[in-house]
Amino acid sequence: MVHLTAEEKSSVTSLWGKMNVDEAGGEALGRLLVVYPWTQRFFDNFGNLSSSSAIMGNPKVKAHGKKVLTSFGDAIKNMDNLKGAFAKLSELHCDKLHVDPENFRLLGNVLVIILVTHFGKDFTPEVQVAWQKLVSGVATALAHKYH
């Protein structure tokens, strides 16, 4: 899977400890739905997704975004076993929800953008390396059931 050094794990954990999951989760999922509008088809029960402002202000988007980032917190607790940590979510997204696994990669990239906007100068290139490894590993773990 993905190998993070002890230093990379520390930088991920440190930054995550400062993360406002409620706020950032809604931002990340909202941005995914705005930037990649075809992903909206998986959220047809979320109500008004007709514009960027409607999406970013949608309470269901915010609530599900929080849920998504909370599961990312689980990844941080299980960086050495992402496949195991995401086995059930992989099965759910593959077998029941039929989500295109490419969307996991897109969400990971959006999360990195959210981290940059929230942490600015603290999100150094070295910190980004660690986070890119993590979001790539999470995307691979979530896509595991598809193979």
From Swiss-Prot:
<feature type="binding site" description="distal binding residue">
    <location>
        <position position="64"/>
    </location>
    <ligand>
        <name>heme b</name>
    </ligand>
</feature>
<dbReference type="InterPro" id="IPR000971">
    <property type="entry name" value="Globin"/>
</dbReference>
<dbReference type="InterPro" id="IPR009050">
    <property type="entry name" value="Globin-like_sf"/>
</dbReference>
<keyword id="KW-0479">Metal-binding</keyword>
<dbReference type="GO" id="GO:0043177">
    <property type="term" value="F:organic acid binding"/>
</dbReference>
<protein>
    <recommendedName>
        <fullName>Hemoglobin subunit epsilon</fullName>
    </recommendedName>
</protein>
<feature type="modified residue" description="Phosphoserine">
    <location>
        <position position="14"/>
    </location>
</feature>
<dbReference type="GO" id="GO:0005833">
    <property type="term" value="C:hemoglobin complex"/>
</dbReference>
<keyword id="KW-0349">Heme</keyword>
<feature type="domain" description="Globin">
    <location>
        <begin position="3"/>
        <end position="147"/>
    </location>
</feature>
<dbReference type="GO" id="GO:0019825">
    <property type="term" value="F:oxygen binding"/>
</dbReference>
<dbReference type="GO" id="GO:0031721">
    <property type="term" value="F:hemoglobin alpha binding"/>
</dbReference>
<feature type="binding site" description="proximal binding residue">
    <location>
        <position position="93"/>
    </location>
    <ligand>
        <name>heme b</name>
    </ligand>
</feature>
<dbReference type="GO" id="GO:0004601">
    <property type="term" value="F:peroxidase activity"/>
</dbReference>
<dbReference type="GO" id="GO:0005344">
    <property type="term" value="F:oxygen carrier activity"/>
</dbReference>
<dbReference type="GO" id="GO:0031838">
    <property type="term" value="C:haptoglobin-hemoglobin complex"/>
</dbReference>
<dbReference type="InterPro" id="IPR002337">
    <property type="entry name" value="Hemoglobin_b"/>
</dbReference>
<dbReference type="InterPro" id="IPR050056">
    <property type="entry name" value="Hemoglobin_oxygen_transport"/>
</dbReference>
<dbReference type="InterPro" id="IPR012292">
    <property type="entry name" value="Globin/Proto"/>
</dbReference>
<keyword id="KW-0813">Transport</keyword>
<comment type="similarity">
    <text>Belongs to the globin family.</text>
</comment>
<keyword id="KW-0597">Phosphoprotein</keyword>
<keyword id="KW-0561">Oxygen transport</keyword>
<dbReference type="GO" id="GO:0042744">
    <property type="term" value="P:hydrogen peroxide catabolic process"/>
</dbReference>
<dbReference type="GO" id="GO:0046872">
    <property type="term" value="F:metal ion binding"/>
</dbReference>
<keyword id="KW-0408">Iron</keyword>
<dbReference type="GO" id="GO:0031720">
    <property type="term" value="F:haptoglobin binding"/>
</dbReference>
<comment type="function">
    <text>The epsilon chain is a beta-type chain of early mammalian embryonic hemoglobin.</text>
</comment>
<comment type="subunit">
    <text>Heterotetramer of two alpha chains and two epsilon chains in early embryonic hemoglobin Gower-2; two zeta chains and two epsilon chains in early embryonic hemoglobin Gower-1.</text>
</comment>
<feature type="modified residue" description="Phosphoserine">
    <location>
        <position position="51"/>
    </location>
</feature>
<dbReference type="GO" id="GO:0020037">
    <property type="term" value="F:heme binding"/>
</dbReference>
<dbReference type="Pfam" id="PF00042">
    <property type="entry name" value="Globin"/>
</dbReference>
<dbReference type="GO" id="GO:0072562">
    <property type="term" value="C:blood microparticle"/>
</dbReference>
